[in-house]
Regions:
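Generic protein-terminus/edge-of-domain signal
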Residues: 1-52, 57
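Short histidine-centered beta-strand/loop micro-motifs
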Residues: 15-22, 62-65, 160-161
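Amphipathic, well-ordered alpha-helical segments in soluble domains
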Residues: 26, 113-120, 140, 144-147
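Short beta-strand His + acidic residue motifs that chelate non-heme Fe in jelly-roll/DSBH
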Residues: 36-38, 60-67
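Histidine-centered metal-chelating micro-motifs
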Residues: 52, 56-62, 81-82
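A hydrophobic/aromatic-rich effector-binding and dimerization subdomain
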Residues: 65-127
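Short, charged, low-hydrophobicity "junction" segments
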Residues: 89-97, 142-153
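Short, Lys/Arg-enriched, Trp-marked, Pro/Gly-tolerant hinge/linker segments that flank
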Residues: 106, 128-136, 148-181
Length: 181
């Protein structure tokens, strides 16, 4: 696995097109301005401090950033995210909720944590000479994912989902994403 191609951190839209042959999940932190987009046939608007997590970027339409829009984006391949996702059934609840509403309005404290996660990932990606490169990159992404879970649980509440239900929901979500329904 070439980890430098599995995860990319950039600061502008359009570098990885939504119709790219290579699928990437997008984690976008809005740093300034606004950005409107249509996802899953619903309209959303990002403001400074908002985090948007999109699992299926091909469902994005009509992206309209303001002239002063600034952001940081983590693009990660699904296989890399699967590798880094902690063994928690919360991931399924979050995935389903993000499919319905991919925007989280972060508190100022959460924004600091999120920005720190993005910065750490960017530094880890660049540090290819680290003797434990793979492990540090996976660890940094896993920490970011746990923070994303925490943001989501604090904003929308936490509920228990059994392992069996999480597995069924995961398969159902993959069918929806693939258009086989």
């Amino acid at each position: 696995m070439d980890y430098q191609k599995d995860i990319i951190v950039i600061d502008k839209l359009g570098v990885v097109p939504t119709d790219s042959e290579v699928e990437y999940l997008a984690h976008l932190l809005c740093l300034g301005g606004t950005c409107r987009y249509r996802f899953n046939e619903r309209d959303f608007e990002l403001h400074a401090g908002d985090l948007s997590i999109i699992r299926k970027r091909k469902l994005i339409e009509k992206t309209e950033p303001s002239d002063d829009f600034r952001c940081k984006i983590i693009y990660a391949k699904p296989g890399f995210i699967d590798l880094c996702t902690p063994q928690s059934n919360y991931g399924m609840k979050g995935s389903l909720a993000l499919f319905l509403n991919p925007v989280m309005h972060l508190t100022p404290e959460q924004q600091i944590v999120c920005r720190r996660d993005f910065d750490l990932l960017e530094r880890r990606i660049a540090d290819t000479e680290h003797r434990f490169y793979r492990e540090t990159l996976v660890n940094a992404m896993q920490a970011a994912i746990l923070d994303f879970f925490d943001f989501h649980a604090r904003i929308y509440g936490e509920s228990d989902i059994s392992t069996q239900n999480a597995s069924i929901m995961n398969r159902f979500l993959k069918m929806l994403e693939a258009g086989t329904y």
